[in-house]
Regions:
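Short cysteine/histidine-rich metal-coordination sites, predominantly Zn2+-binding motifs
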Residues: 125-139, 150-165
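Disulfide-bonded cysteine motifs in exported proteins
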Residues: 105, 131-134, 145-146
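N-terminal pre-ligand scaffold of iron-sulfur
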Residues: 9-125, 144, 160-175
Length: 175
């Protein structure tokens, strides 16, 4: 069954289609995670509905708020930030295969506890420490973002999305 292997089965079938142009936002928190020269820095992206703005926090202690511009509003980016208002992006520091570090985009909800189809939908956000370990407060699972989001104290795998970046102050696209 070699047809069932490969990268087609490592990504979520939920499509965010999030597009952020950091050349217009100039957000330093997001830029730090989009920099290939700083692997191990991850940025959580959230939407603040009361401000119509992005809220960025990094696992290195940075945080910033950046208002939507007209293009963000036009694209409907407020509804494209993960399954429940949260994405984590960054270069993994243990993924260098000789061609550079791998850029990842993860959903910010625990893949074990969160159910997109549950009524009512309950949030199980992951918290990230400075080493790039994401922890669920509910099930206590820990996921290593630097190795692709594998669970390090149980079973499971982070929900990942296809993502590209054009550098710190370029375009971030998460599919």
């Amino acid at each position: 069954m070699s047809a069932c292997k490969g990268e087609n089965f490592t990504y979520s079938n939920f499509h965010c289609n999030l597009y952020i142009d950091n050349s217009t936002h100039h957000d330093p928190t997001l830029a730090s995670a989009m920099n290939a020269m700083s692997p191990g820095v991850f940025c959580t992206i959230k939407y603040l509905p009361n401000r119509n703005a992005y809220f960025f926090t990094s696992n290195q202690g940075q945080s910033s708020t950046n208002n939507f511009d007209a293009k963000d509003t036009e694209r409907g980016n407020s509804s494209r930030i993960g399954m429940n208002n949260g994405l984590i992006v960054g270069y993994a520091n243990l993924s260098n295969d000789g061609s550079g570090y791998h850029f990842y985009a993860f959903d910010a909800q625990c893949p074990v506890c969160f159910d997109y189809n549950a009524i009512p939908m309950r949030s199980y956000p992951l918290s990230i420490n400075g080493s790039g370990i994401a922890t669920c407060a509910n099930c206590k699972r820990q996921f290593n973002l630097n190795t692709g989001g594998n669970c390090i104290n149980n079973t499971g795998q982070m929900t990942t999305y296809r993502a590209t970046t054009a550098g710190p102050f370029g375009i971030l696209f998460i599919n």
